[in-house]
Amino acid sequence: MSVLVNKDSKIIVQGFTGSEGTFHASQMIDYGTNVVGGVTPGKGGQEHLGKPVFNTVDEAVQKAGADTSIIFVPPAFAADAIMEAAEAGIKVIICITEGIPTADMVKVKAYIDQLDCTLVGPNCPGVITPEEAKVGIMPGFIFKKGKVGIVSKSGTLTYEAADQVVKQGYGITTAIGIGGDPIIGTTTKEAVELLMNDDETEAIVMIGEIGGNLEAEAARWIKADGNRKPVVGFIAGQTAPAGRTMGHAGAIVGGADDTAQAKMKILAENGVHVVESPAKIGEMVAKVLA
């Protein structure tokens, strides 16, 4: 069983004919992902990358049976694109776009919380279930099928963790890049919970960073849930100065609990196997699965 996306997912690309959408959609198709079409308003009826183009998400749902969407739409229009997908009945919405105004995301979050759908992102690398579906911008060749789930705020650290896990002789069930913005659809805790409840996932790598309380919330849930599966944790930003945004919009130390040190302490107190360097992730996974 996989989480969020699999070989049966029927995926559409919003912003399909733009340069980003075109490049990444073609990579997804080459990977073997079941892309059933795309959406670009005003270009409906055309064909692009051998797939149909629709004017609206609703049309893509009606005609192609789409149930999953990936969004490559400019920041000013991305919030509307997310809400359009949700309203059309798309079940899994993955938004890659970086730079969506926070005020827009407040509205999006309130809207999608009323509907039966899952938003991953924005400002994320996407989701991959190796050898089944790559719905994102990650380099697919790094990921091999296996039994370790990954939840990460960082795109590049997701790839690094996957590479190490694979080199240790294990593989990945599903990797979820949740994104680094202050307001995101799927939280660390929610993503970890999905993997905890996945039969094929035997261990989880959880990668966080400074800013916010998502990792602490996840760690407390992991303990309350009975530490059913081993979780390896890493927090990026251990040398970050307070009050300065570091890379991601959400990566800013506001209070004492936002620091990497404070988060690592909370993780360890709740039974997470914390590593101090990303270079140690693979070794720790091998240790907890031995």
What are these regions (language model features)?
Residues 1-290:
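Catalytic-core regions of core metabolic enzymes
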